[in-house]
Amino acid sequence: MVYPGRMADTSHALSSSVLRERLEAAFPSLLEELTQLVAIPSVSSDPAHAADVERSAEHIRERFAALGLDAKVLRETAADGTEGKPALVAHSPRIEGAPTVLLYAHHDVQPVGELSRWSMDPYKAEVRGDRIYGRGSSDDGAGITVHL
C-alpha cells in the first residue's frame, strides 16, 4: 500500500489483478475502520450528541496522525460567540513532482429517526452479503475510510 509521504513507483500502471489483490488484502482493516466510525453516533444536528461529534473528529484526527499526516481539528466561532462544529484538516508534505490532491468527506451523520423502523442497531456496522449497513456507513464513513 502507498501511505502519505511515500510515492509509489508510478513508472508502470498497476494491472487490475494486482490492484484487486491489494484491495482484497486491505479490506479487513478497512472494514474494521468503518465499523469504528459507524459506532460513533456523531449526529451534528442534535446537541445531545455534541460530545460524539467531537469524538468522531478526534478519532479521525488520530488515524490520520498515525499515518504521518499533520492533522488538526478546527472550529470557527460565530459572531455571537457560538463555537462551531469540529472540522478536520490533514495534509502531508508536498512531494516534488507529484500533483496536489484534495479529498473531502464529512464525519457527522443524520439522526436515526424511529428506532422501531430499524432491523438492526444503527450504530453497529453489519455485513449482509456484499453490503455494509449502519448509520453513516456510506455517507460518509466509507469515504473517510478510503481516504485513510
Each predicted region: which residue ranges?
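Intrinsic structural disorder
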Residues: 1-2, 41
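Short, positively charged and aromatic/hydrophobic N-terminal segments
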Residues: 2-3, 9
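Acidic/His- and Gly-rich active-site-bordering loop/insert found
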Residues: 9-137, 144
